[in-house]
Regions:
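Charged, alpha-helix-forming regions
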Residues: 1-218
Length: 218
């Protein structure tokens, strides 16, 4: 039995409650400021748009840890999930990305992974794809106890670290790792899974971990 399964059985005997995203974080969209490219002064601070860093500028409007979710433009992946970025430190965010910060009771890193697992295809509207603020705020989030959130984050952070390492090595292995990561992410964040399914996931994880020891990294 995996540590995660033990935690879920201990902390969530009656299942997991769902809350609106707006109840799980602070949404800071009203503090965003767009700056045209011609008006930007070059500098050291990342300037974020819908799908990540667009430029580096001389000033910042946010300082801390944040999750950014594409609002309009390139805001959806081929699998129907939103475009999500993790941002730390001093940054500038334009009005093409929703920005959220942590509140007590819900880990920001957990939301970072959870939002990536949500299918928002039916929420995207317009000729220019847009995830409007109303739909964004109403995304339903499964909110397990903090101990469960922490364990999910630990597992997914490990996969993210491995993927980052492998990106400098074997592209084929990276693709397999990415598929494995997405599989585990979706399984770990699907609280409708039965305990038997979690048993299978634990066995799956152990098998993959054992196989990894056989990879020759010359």
């Amino acid at each position: 039995m995996s540590n995660l399964e033990k935690l879920i059985r201990e902390k969530c005997p009656n299942g997991v409650k769902f809350r609106k995203l707006s109840e799980c974080c602070n949404i800071l969209d009203n503090k965003r400021k767009p700056v045209t490219k011609s008006a930007r002064e070059k500098g050291e601070y990342p300037y974020y748009g819908a799908n990540g860093i667009q430029d580096y500028v001389s000033d910042y409007i946010f300082d801390g840890c944040f999750v950014l979710v594409g609002e309009d433009g390139s805001v959806i992946t081929p699998s129907g999930n939103p475009v999500v970025n993790w941002a730390e430190g001093k940054i500038w965010v334009n009005n093409h990305a929703h920005i959220i910060e942590e509140i007590d009771g819900v880990l920001l890193r957990y939301l970072y992974y959870y939002i990536q697992s949500v299918n928002v295809r039916e929420l995207i509207h317009g000729n220019i794809p847009k995830l409007n603020q109303g739909d964004f705020k109403n995304i339903r989030v499964a909110v397990p106890p903090l101990e469960v959130q922490q364990e999910i984050v630990r597992v997914l952070d490990n996969f993210s670290f491995l993927s980052a390492e492998l990106s400098a090595e074997l592209s084929a292995e990276l693709k397999a790792r990415q598929q494995q990561y997405e599989y585990y992410r979706n399984k770990l964040l699907n609280f409708n899974e039965s305990p038997e399914s979690l048993d299978t996931l634990h066995t799956h994880t152990h098998t993959h971990t054992h196989t990894d020891t056989l990879v020759d990294k010359k």
